[in-house]
Amino acid sequence: MRGARGAWDFLCVLLLLLRVQTGSSQPSASPGEWSLPSIHPATSELIVSAGDEIRLLCTDPGFVKWTFETLGQSSEITHNEWITEKAEATNTGNYTCTNGGGLSSSIYVFVRDPAKLFLVDLPLYGKEDHDTLVRCPLTDPEVTNYSLRGCEGKPLPKDLTFVTDPKAGITIRNVKREYHRLCLHCSADRKGKSVLSKKFTLKVRAAIRAVPVVSVSKASHLLREGEEFSVMCLIKDVSSSVDSMWIKENSPQTNAQPQSNSWHQGDFNFVRQERLTISSARVNDSGVFMCYANNTFGSANVTTTLEVVAKGFINIFPMMNTTIFVNDGENVDLIVEYEAYPKPEHQRWVYMNRTLTDKWEDYPKSDNESNIRYVSELHLTRLKGNEGGTYTFQVSNSDVNSSVTLNVYVNTKPEILTHESLVSGILQCLVAGFPEPTVDWYFCPGAEQRCPVPVGPLDVQMQNSSVSPSGKLVVQSSIDYSAFKHNGTVECRASNNVGKTSAFFNFAFKGNSKEQMHPHTLFTPLLIGFVIAAGMMCIIVMILTYKYLQKPMYEVQWKVVEEINGNNYVYIDPTQLPYDHKWEFPRNRLSFGKTLGAGAFGKVVEATAYGLIKSDAAMTVAVKMLKPSAHLTEREALMSELKVLSYLGNHMNIVNLLGACTVGGPTLVITEYCCYGDLLNFLRRKRDSFICSKQEDHAEVALYKNLLQSKESSCNDSTNEYMDMKPGVSYVVPTKADKRRSARIGSYIERDVTPAIMEDDELALDLEDLLSFSYQVAKGMAFLASKNCIHRDLAARNILLTHGRITKICDFGLARDIKNDSNYVVKGNARLPVKWMAPESIFNCVYTFESDVWSYGIFLWELFSLGSSPYPGMPVDSKFYKMIKEGFRMLSPEHAPAEMYDIMKTCWDADPLKRPTFKQIVQLIEKQISDSTNHIYSNLANCSPNRERPTAVDHCVRINSVGSSTSSTQPLLVHEDA
């Protein structure tokens, strides 16, 4: 058959050649005479089965060609007959016959294949806000329920609409960005069964609705010749189709070499870096460089300025007149600004050829990286007359030195430096002062110490003036007394607009001779000695008083509020709180161990209490006591702390009172013992083993890591702070639930931990733990707030940790050595934890429930940075206070989820009334912790005996409950089976 068809084709070609050469007996159709070619079979659709023949015949007077199209692909032949011997599903498509006049007729052929109901064209792309076609045409048009389905039975988005076409596929209308990565199947029912196509994953190209975002690493550059110029331009857009380039304004020629690097950040964020570099900049490279980017929406640009100088420079700008007048005893600040490039290496202030080592500061005018302007300030306090003169500021860098001199004149009353009688019969006064003093001479009869009624002024014989190094004007004045014939007193009086002073010469005639004159001295040596002694005594008393006031005074940090008037809180005097003697515990039943912490006033000691639970049971406790050197003030403060703890009652997340010894010896306060010490040191120990995940399925990995390491310190490690000592235990792999459940009822009843459960301190730390700590501390603070109690020193160092990783809020108080703790900064006569304090507490000494919320936000930052100090690298100085006033806040710590950082930021709101309450914080964190952690915490809270369940109410409502709740029993002294 194929041979016959080949012969037929050859014959047709031969006839065509003959027709071209000899002409045709039939005239060619003119363009206006063409008609549609006809196709046999004469139908718009044809259905054949797989394996059958497809035979299509096109009839037309002229030549024709067949075109087959399916899934965007096409093929063609120039015969008038299309034959496919064994049809396959892929032969499904549109067959078009076109004649020489461009007219065409079509027939759509379905090749029914039971094994292949859909033709699939992958991948699937769509453009936002446009329709997109899912190319899954049917091979059998007689199926039903042709539609789209989500993969794995997932529903399609509610707003997704589509239309079906068995020949083309399914068109999704108005594609949205949210459909990106949507998994789809085409589906249809055949013979009562649902059939699915291959999986489609829709990739949405975002619609461009804005110009690109363009930024540069540095807005201006100042360089010396030969230095490298490098600037980075960052372009962000939703699509990689964005175009970008560097352009030098007004100069198409440049030596700069551009480099480009790009990547996708997520699904709809495209980032491109355009770096421009000049390896060795020259002066003529100076100019403005523009980073230009455009997309289909529009264009954007940003510029950076390059200035290249031949050599470095320093330009000084005094911020005041170079001549300054100041009154005696006043303060003055000498301020200069200067520009320097390269950076200044040496700065100093010089006075009278002497370098000043203090009283001045030098700092950049802004924190901008390109800043070249600096400020230097010299602070002169309570200037004296002899401290005037020239003050010179000198600055240098690697290229140049520069200086500026300021002349300071101190307005002082005249001072008589010398007054003497010269052998030649001349009286002389040497006077210094500013402005220039006027010297007058007066005579009065009689040998008086002062002239009650002066006569004169006398004629001055000689007077001249000069300038002293300190800026004073020195006047030398003299008169001739040889003409005097009578006893008398001569007064040298110096004055200016600041004041006046005098010196006296008295003399007498004896016979015909004149007695040698002596200058009068105002004070006798005895009077001078008395004044000096009195001054020294005053200085000694002031020093002793200052040292006494600087001594840190101990007070209870926790304050109980009695009344709120606006922002003014009235606190209950803790000494007026009642104390129930049922808390008393026999001293002889306490056995003391090691010291857990010590401060200036007292210490906390580990102890064993016998009979606290039941008569034959021992319990490890912590006992707070005063040192023997404590005064009455400290003893009253410790008693106040005891009363506050007894007033508060019990809660799972505070260090609870167990008992006290107040009679028959020094006061002892017995509280719960927390074996893992403070949370701050616990976090720092766990940094290396931290797992940045809160999923339970990481538990075994974390434990395996810990078992391979050398053992970390735990409750069994005597080297740890605040640690109990127990024998070692054997280990099995526990779960997180075991870890917290092992505490059972927290630390209220001391018991041995089951050896099969690994010690909490040897387990790795993960994100779930940090969320749990956040939640527990918020619960504890909500309890304190419900009792109208303000903590005032909430920080990780004041949170203790016990079995089951239960956190407990405490007040170390007298057991903390704040004098040697860098977290406590001297402010006035107190040492305060400034970095944890709210602005209203720092600047206005206002402590409220809201200021505790601020401190809680700082605590969260400590927690999620695994024990780092807040505001790292920033000393507490005037700049720190200024930044806090201006709204500076810390960035998110490394391990904080976005939701927790949002809580931190709300805690740091400048308006205290906009900060959340602790009750609201608890609700926010509850949404983040896992159900298992929340369930375990609830069980621990429920099984603790006599637990109060306070409801954190509004602050104004809390006040009504003050003083109404004092515990009459010892709620923690219960039997083990309670």
Curated annotation (Swiss-Prot):
It is found in: Cell membrane. Disulfide bonds join 58-97, 136-186, 151-183, 233-291, 429-492. It holds the Pfam family ig. ATP binds at residues 597-604, 624, 672-678, 797. Glycans are attached at residues 94, 145, 284, 294, 301, 321, 353, 368, 401, 464, 487. The modification Phosphoserine is found at residues 742, 747, 822, 892, 961. Keywords: ATP-binding, Cell membrane, Disulfide bond, Glycoprotein, Immunoglobulin domain, Kinase, Magnesium, Membrane, Metal-binding, Nucleotide-binding, Phosphoprotein, Proto-oncogene, Receptor, Repeat, Signal, Transferase, Transmembrane, Transmembrane helix, Tyrosine-protein kinase, Ubl conjugation. Residues 26-525 are extracellular. Gene3D superfamilies: Immunoglobulins, Phosphorylase Kinase, domain 1, Transferase(Phosphotransferase) domain 1. Its main location: membrane. Residues 590-938 form the Protein kinase domain. The keyword Kinase applies. Monomer in the absence of bound KITLG/SCF. Homodimer in the presence of bound KITLG/SCF, forming a heterotetramer with two KITLG/SCF molecules. Interacts (via phosphorylated tyrosine residues) with the adapter proteins GRB2 and GRB7 (via SH2 domain), and SH2B2/APS. Interacts (via C-terminus) with MPDZ (via the tenth PDZ domain). Interacts (via phosphorylated tyrosine residues) with PIK3R1 and PIK3CD. Interacts (via phosphorylated tyrosine) with CRK (isoform Crk-II), FYN, SHC1 and MATK/CHK (via SH2 domain). Interacts with LYN and FES/FPS. This is Mast/stem cell growth factor receptor Kit. The gene is KIT.
